[in-house]
Amino acid sequence: MRGVIAQITPNSSIPKEVDFHGGIAFLDRDGVLNVGYSTYVNSPQEVNMLPGAGKSVAILRRKGWKICIVTNQSPVMRGLWDENTLHDINDELRRQLLDEDEGAHVDVILACPHRSRDRCACRKPYPGMLFLGSEIIRGGNYDNSNLIDGRGIIAINPMLRNVDWWGTKTEPPHRLDLMLGDRKCDLGVAWAYGARIFRANPDIGIAGQINEMIDEGNEGVTFNPVG
């Protein structure tokens, strides 16, 4: 499988409570929005939203951010389950978020299905998913020819794997772009893309970081990708 598994919510289905200020909140999934397990989240029945996740997503939206979930999901390429199961899992997470707060809409969910050995440009810490999310949300150019009702595979530019980890952190497409995750690969992808970097406690998730994230003057944590 080449490319990212995408779920894109049509703009018409998302209520515009506030104006989009241009920033995107990139969120890891497991350990940020729902409980993560060492054996993966393998079915909708295993989706357990972390308390306050729905309210936190709604806060971000009401403050002007759009939401893009970016998650590594190698079980697809490992043959544990398929693309349809992934969509079912994500649909259940969306449902739980909205049950907690009706404003907790997610604009885009992107999942890398690859293993480390597949050497793709989308598996975090490589920044392919973040740049793709930016293109989708900001109306840039991307190949949507394989999408049906906003779902399907989108190819990633393999050159996005060429990251100078010994260089300096790049500038993001927008100064308010941020990334929240619970693992080193999440910090790395934020650095490679240029986003403000926030780290979640996987037992608490996004609710433990939301006040810092919405502070536009907070640059987040410092991260050295080769340290």
Regions found by a protein language model. Give the residues of each.
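Asp-based, Mg2+/Mn2+-dependent phosphohydrolase catalytic module
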Residues: 1-25, 84, 91-103, 117-227
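Active-site neighborhood of HAD-like aspartate-dependent phosphohydrolases
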Residues: 1-68
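Metal-dependent phosphoesterase signature
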Residues: 24-51, 76-85, 99-102, 114-120
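Short alpha-helical scaffold segments that flank and stabilize functional sites
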Residues: 28, 56-59, 74, 136, ...
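A short alpha-helix capping/helix-coil boundary motif
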Residues: 34-37, 72-73, 164-167
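Short loop/turn and capping residues at structural boundaries
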Residues: 37, 68-71, 110, 145, ...
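Substrate-recognition element of Asp-dependent hydrolases with the DxDx(T/V) motif
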Residues: 53, 57-90, 104-118
